[in-house]
């Protein structure tokens, strides 16, 4: 199949490309996929991507009435950050009579693209996005249609969009200084794959700068982990613990989800906190104070980031045409006994 490069792509084009009826494509676009076979769903997805299809009711600006619907696209719904940010978005939506359509991408650019196109088809009035770093063409299309789009936590420097985030470099440096001040000489960073995700890249860069100076022999231990692969994580932890056992060891977990996985795997391996390995991480939650000796974390203002992002959406909906803003909210280190 070849991408259509001229003219306006229609539902008929998609149907012909996918080998299905127009009504089947319409049901798919409107989220009514229960009665569509998995094979047809796959073919429709492929046709939409290859034809670069945009639902005409949005592409031509034919909205008859306001939907009062906000799209909130999160990279990982199981991450404590996503849950707290959602609560902040929800509070503002409830206050102003908006509904939320929540989409989870599992950090997949392909799934993110699919979710963005579905939100476009549902006539969302605004979008809050925890981005994968891809699909900039779709986001530009949102901007062309004057759909307010706010980035939360993750930046996309190439796009002129409002962004709500924290100063990742500064707060990462602060927590690492506290780790090293406790006498740790072998500090590792455990993270999900960094790819083009800005907070991970910023935090990892600070770690590499500091570890190259303060770790024994300038050793940089950057572990990129698939959080769904428990055996890989256990193997990485076991290896880190056994290598250079005379050194005082600590781990900085790059987000709340990987911290959860590390704590679980350490328990299974019989590794004690902090006697065997000290730990610290991001995304403070209530249960961190209840685990073992209490976990040292960075408390991100995740809830307030959600509120602030939604407030920016409302200002844009109300007609604010000002230059895009980057709003940095303050994070803080919470010291407990895990170091």
Swiss-Prot record:
Ranges for domain HTH lacI-type: 9-64
Pfam families tied to this protein: LacI (PF00356), Peripla_BP_3 (PF13377)
Record keywords, A-Z: DNA-binding, Repressor, Transcription, Transcription regulation
DNA-binding region, residue intervals: 11-30
Keyword rRNA-binding attached: no
GO molecular function (one): DNA-binding transcription factor activity
InterPro entries linked to this entry: Cro/C1-type_HTH, DNA_ligase_ATP-dep_cent, HTH_LacI, LacI/GalR-like_sensor, Lambda_DNA-bd_dom_sf, Peripla_BP_I
Induction: Induced by galacturonate and negatively regulated by itself. Is subject to catabolite repression by glucose involving the ccpA gene.
GO BP terms: DNA recombination; DNA repair; regulation of DNA-templated transcription
Annotated PANTHER family: LACI-RELATED TRANSCRIPTIONAL REPRESSOR, RIBOSE OPERON REPRESSOR
Function field: Transcriptional repressor of the kdgRKAT and kduID operons for pectin utilization.
Protein name: HTH-type transcriptional regulator KdgR
């Amino acid at each position: 199949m070849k991408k259509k490069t001229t003219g306006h792509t229609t539902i008929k084009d998609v149907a012909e490309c996918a080998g299905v009826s127009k009504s089947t494509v319409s049901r798919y676009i409107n989220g009514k996929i229960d009665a569509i076979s998995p094979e047809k769903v796959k073919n429709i997805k492929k046709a939409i991507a290859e034809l670069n299809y945009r639902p005409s009711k949005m592409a031509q600006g034919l909205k008859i009435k306001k939907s009062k619907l906000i799209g909130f696209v999160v990279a990982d719904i199981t991450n404590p950050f996503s849950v707290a940010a959602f609560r902040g978005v929800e509070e503002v939506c409830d206050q102003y009579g908006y509904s939320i359509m929540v989409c989870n991408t599992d950090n997949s650019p392909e799934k993110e693209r699919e979710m963005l196109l579905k939100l476009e088809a549902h006539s969302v009035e605004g979008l809050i996005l925890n981005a994968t770093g891809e699909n900039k063409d779709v986001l530009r299309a949102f901007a062309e249609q004057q759909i307010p789009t706010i980035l939360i936590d993750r930046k996309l420097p190439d796009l002129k969009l409002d962004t709500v985030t924290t100063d990742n470099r500064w707060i990462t440096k602060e927590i690492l200084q506290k780790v090293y001040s406790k006498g740790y000489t072998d500090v590792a960073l455990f993270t999900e794959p960094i790819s083009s995700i800005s907070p991970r890249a910023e935090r990892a860069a600070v770690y590499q700068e500091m570890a190259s100076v303060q770790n024994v022999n300038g050793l940089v231990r950057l572990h990129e982990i698939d959080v769904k692969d428990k055996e890989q994580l256990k193997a990485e932890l076991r290896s880190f613990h056994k290598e250079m056992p005379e050194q005082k060891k600590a781990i900085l977990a790059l987000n709340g989800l990987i911290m959860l996985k590390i704590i679980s795997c350490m328990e299974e391996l019989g590794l004690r906190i902090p006697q065997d390995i000290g730990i610290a991480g991001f995304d403070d939650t209530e249960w961190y104070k209840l685990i073992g000796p209490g976990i040292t974390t960075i408390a991100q203002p995740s809830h307030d980031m959600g509120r602030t992002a939604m407030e920016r959406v409302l200002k844009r909906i109300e007609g604010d045409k000002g230059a895009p803003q980057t709003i940095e909210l303050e994070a803080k280190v919470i010291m407990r006994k895990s170091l």
